[in-house]
């Protein structure tokens, strides 16, 4: 059985010609700088035409040097308004579906996860197109992309995903790496309609908060997992200070234990220190784990 990292981000810039872009605000620059330093990249690399290739090659090297066989590489859709038009001033990043699909064709280590806003006028057509090209998963960030997944007009979109067996990886809980446009959509209850339609849904970050004042949606997630057998969670970024409280229920809850999948949230930097401080690993394990420099491992 292959070991898969279900939650790996691609980052690209407008200088590469791949159609990607990244917008770093002054408020978020320190966090982006930290992520780049962890990859041995200078902040200035974001402006270089070679950045996409540098980021791709580092990721491939990390995967190949790890116990992971492949990673789900996430596209990043634009932010859309409720009327289906692009919200041009919103969003921090864009990674086209075609770029992720192409990388997956070129490298066996990548599994393509596309991103389609269901409010797009061509959402159904784009979903068909991506499925034909080998999409293995769909990723969305409801609170960052302005997606009310419970809107009844999206039901045909969710039905098609259910019929074709395409799983949905949906951000749940707070978010501070990317711009949030509707904080209410961080609630896992936002995923009720796709669940009712039969979509296999993975609640990214297990509905944990990203900041000290974010609501704790873990109890909501557990309640929904009792109600829906097609709801899962992932471990992405649970080894950061603010989300680490979610580690214990993911490890110890009988309900969650069999329905939690692995995700690194690469390139978000994590540390085993938080599992140690939460009493989930001992000091010897922490000492051993902190020697691992490969973020995918």
Regions found by a protein language model. Give the residues of each.
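Active-site environment of divalent metal-dependent phosphoester hydrolases
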Residues: 9-14, 78-81, 118-122, 145, ...
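Short, flexible/disordered intra-domain loops and linkers
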Residues: 43-48, 80-92, 177-185, 209-217, ...
């Amino acid at each position: 059985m292959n070991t898969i990292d279900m939650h790996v981000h691609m980052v690209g810039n407008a200088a590469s010609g791949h159609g990607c872009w990244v917008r770093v605000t002054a408020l978020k620059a320190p966090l982006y700088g930290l992520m780049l330093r962890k990859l041995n990249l200078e902040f200035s690399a974001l402006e270089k035409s070679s950045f996409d290739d540098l980021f791709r090659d580092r990721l491939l090297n990390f995967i190949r040097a790890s116990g992971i066989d492949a990673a789900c590489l996430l596209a990043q859709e634009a932010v859309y308004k409720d009327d289906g038009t692009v919200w041009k001033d919103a969003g921090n990043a864009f990674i086209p579906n075609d770029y992720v699909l192409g990388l997956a064709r070129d490298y066996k280590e990548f599994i393509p996860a596309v991103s389609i806003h269901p409010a797009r006028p061509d959402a159904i057509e784009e979903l068909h197109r991506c499925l034909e090209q080998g999409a293995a998963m769909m990723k969305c960030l409801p609170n960052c992309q302005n997606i009310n997944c419970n809107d009844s007009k999206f039901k045909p979109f969710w039905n098609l995903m259910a019929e074709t067996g395409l799983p949905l990886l949906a951000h749940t809980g707070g978010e501070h790496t990317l711009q949030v446009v509707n904080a209410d959509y961080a609630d896992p209850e936002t995923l009720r309609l796709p669940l009712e339609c039969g979509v296999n849904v993975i609640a990214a970050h297990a509905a944990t908060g990203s900041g000290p004042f974010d609501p704790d949606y873990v109890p909501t997630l557990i309640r929904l997992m009792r109600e829906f057998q097609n709801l899962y969670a992932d471990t992405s970024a649970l080894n950061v200070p603010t989300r680490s409280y979610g580690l214990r229920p993911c490890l110890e809850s009988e309900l969650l234990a069999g329905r939690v999948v692995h995700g690194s949230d690469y390139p978000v930097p994590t540390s085993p220190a938080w599992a140690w401080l939460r009493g989930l690993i001992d000091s010897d394990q922490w000492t051993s784990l902190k020697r691992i420099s490969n973020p995918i491992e």
